[in-house]
Amino acid sequence: VQPHASVLQPEPLGTGNAVRVALAALDGFTGDVLVLFGADPLVRPETLKCLLAARQGPDVPAIAVLGFRPEDPSLYGRLVVAFDGALEAVVEARDATPEQTKIGLCNGGGMAFDGKRIKELIAAIGNDNARNEFYLTDVVAIARDRGWACAYVETDADELIGVNSRADLAHASADELAR
């Protein structure tokens, strides 16, 4: 949608691949890169500002991830946080260990990246996982392996109501009207 570039992912090979394909439209850009899922239309602008601000934190994190605590976390990837509050990893629900499934803090999908480091992070994503896909969430562990800080911002679950059906759309519309 003008003035923004649109990029189509030719094959559905995972969220990491979708971002890899989109990077061509960002050639030469070095500012913050915000990655959001189209199925989450209720994320507030204030939340996105907090996500971008977290990327400017004391350790200048390479990535800031949006997190939330749903009533039923069983369908979501988990944010693995160290004792010092640093984000260590994002683990997809189907790849989580029994211990990780006990974590209530879940991946909300949105991420803010350092534009100078995003290409290196995306290029390092592999597809050795339960779905043989390129998971965008792997970038957190990749960044940590490089010694780069990662952060998270927790938001309300009502901002992350996934819209994947007409029923979901009706529910999200009602929530938006109630705001």
Regions found by a protein language model. Give the residues of each.
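Catalytic-core segments of class I nucleotidyltransferases/pyrophosphorylases
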Residues: 87-177
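Generic low-polarity alpha-helical segments
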Residues: 1, 6-7, 26, 30, ...
